[in-house]
Amino acid sequence: VSEQSEFPDGQYPERPVERHKGPVVLRRDRRDQGSTTDQRLLDSRGPSDWVHTDPWRVLRIQAEFVEGFGALAEVPRAVTVFGSARTKRDHPEYELGRKIGAALADAGFAVMTGGGPGAMEAVNRGANEAGGFSVGLGIELPFEQGLNPWVDLGVNFRYFFARKTMFVKYSQAFICLPGGFGTLDELFEALTLVQTKKVTKFPVVLFGTEYWGGLYDWIAKSVLGGGKIGEKDLDLLHLTDDIDDAVRVVQESYQAWEDTH
């Protein structure tokens, strides 16, 4: 369509008043902040609250991804193990975590955890004591204690979503020990990513039938039974109490992946 047909008699709409802020165009009544980008950057007398604005946060988020990718790019094949930060060192689940970490190390896998205390520490410790490679991806929290001493390679994150990307990208499998909301968050995100084929299928092991059995039964009865997922979706979960069985599932899945790549 020609301009003449859109605007007969040569009557064109008046060009709106506009201001430019870098690549952003402000037109009509869009308010300007009254200064240029360079001025706000170079003027040391100005306010410093600009570092807390959303555009600046984007750069910080980008930096987290760059730092995470750079730090983890050379990590050997790894398995992420989730579990509660509240697990005490004298609790049976702590010793279980140590054994799982050691078993994964013996099988040639690096272990990756959230890097915190409790079950995470136990897994890192077990892998470290067995001579394996132990990775911790920490998160900035008001009550965070920092990375546990059994981490060989640690990366701290401000943002959960950047950290979760690293867990998925650099893991061959997830093993979930008894845990709280954080463990559940990671569990269901992994299931969703695999179900929707956003990531290559990898196993999600629920370790501890007494703890996870109720959740598994609810998914089978209510979620699958109600037609909210397909039958194959339930197969994404493997429920076990046996360390050798958990490691076997991980090894078989990794071997199947290797055979196709």
Where are the model-predicted features located?
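Acidic/glycine-enriched connector segments
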Residues: 118-176
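Short gly/pro/ser/thr-enriched loop/turn and capping motifs at secondary-structure boundaries
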Residues: 141-146, 183, 211-214
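Solvent-exposed alpha-helices and their adjacent loops that cap or buttress functional pockets
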Residues: 72-74, 103-105, 127-128, 145-149, ...
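Glycine-rich beta-alpha loop segments
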Residues: 2-137
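Active-site/ligand-binding-proximal alpha/beta "capping" segment
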Residues: 158-210, 254-258
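Catalytic-core regions of core metabolic enzymes
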Residues: 51, 55-58, 203, 208-211
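Structural motif
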Residues: 77-80, 109-110, 132-136, 152-154, ...
